[in-house]
């Protein structure tokens, strides 16, 4: 009996089957792409909740991102930009809607922020006159309200955020990444948002415990 055959023999004399396990199937590329392209859906129950989301977005940014904001009047687009500014380290109190001047720039934070409002833009010539495309290079973070009025000029790799009314104070928010860089940003944003949510719940429980009456 050869040594190789003895290796395959059990102590009871039965041969051990020489089984080759199949390699684990990889997730199809189409399914991976579908997962990446699926929007991240949230519900904001209040203005502070929307502001907190904006702060997390600001902290997740690395520079050069374009954030396109969509939604009707009063949906919370400017409030979200205030949170982004605060997350970048700028004062949210200085952030106002640039409806009439089109562009506000903020450079007090760790990254420069360009806040753009295209509500009054009606033609391609008006869009070109804003100098919008000049902000899409370098480290400037660009947040664009009413981005649907300038789609032709927007970079293909960006973060799209759609806000819609849900009730009197609550909002439905959908966040979608449209390219490689924005996919990385969105993944980082979701991780930070989960951590922030856990920290917020812990701090809320601690506050409730402090307020709870002591039993005698």
PLM region spans:
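Short phosphate-coordinating micro-motif centered on Lys-Gly-acidic
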Residues: 2-16, 21-32, 40, 122, ...
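N-terminal pre-Walker A segment at the start of P-loop NTPase domains
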Residues: 34-53
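Hydrophobic anchor at the beta1->P-loop junction of P-loop NTPases
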Residues: 67-69
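P-loop (Walker A) phosphate-binding loop of NTP-binding proteins
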Residues: 72
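Conserved lysine of the Walker
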Residues: 77
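Post-Walker A helix-loop "phosphate-sensing" segment adjacent to the P-loop in P-loop NTPases
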Residues: 86-95
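Conserved nucleotide-sensing/catalytic segment adjacent to the nucleotide-binding pocket
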Residues: 99, 103-143
């Amino acid at each position: 009996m050869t040594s190789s055959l003895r290796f395959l023999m059990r102590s009871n004399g039965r041969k051990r089957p020489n089984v080759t396990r199949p390699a684990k199937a990889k997730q199809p590329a189409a399914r991976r792409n579908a997962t990446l392209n699926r929007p991240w859906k949230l519900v904001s129950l209040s203005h502070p909740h929307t502001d907190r989301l904006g702060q997390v977005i600001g902290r997740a940014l690395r520079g050069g991102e374009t954030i396109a904001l969509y939604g009707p009047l009063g949906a919370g687009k400017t409030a979200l930009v205030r949170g982004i500014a605060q997350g970048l380290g700028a004062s949210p109190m200085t952030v106002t809607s640039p409806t009439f001047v089109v562009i506000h720039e903020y450079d007090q934070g760790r990254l420069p922020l360009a806040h753009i409002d295209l509500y009054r833009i009606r033609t391609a010539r008006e869009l070109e006159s804003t100098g919008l495309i000049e902000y899409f290079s370098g480290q400037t973070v660009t947040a664009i309200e009413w981005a649907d009025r300038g789609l032709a000029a927007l970079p293909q790799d960006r973060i799209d955020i759609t806000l819609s009314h849900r009730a009197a104070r609550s909002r439905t928010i959908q966040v979608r990444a449209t390219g490689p860089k924005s996919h990385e940003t969105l993944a980082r944003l979701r991780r930070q948002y989960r951590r922030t949510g856990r920290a917020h719940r812990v701090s809320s429980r601690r506050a409730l415990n402090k307020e709870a009456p002591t039993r005698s």
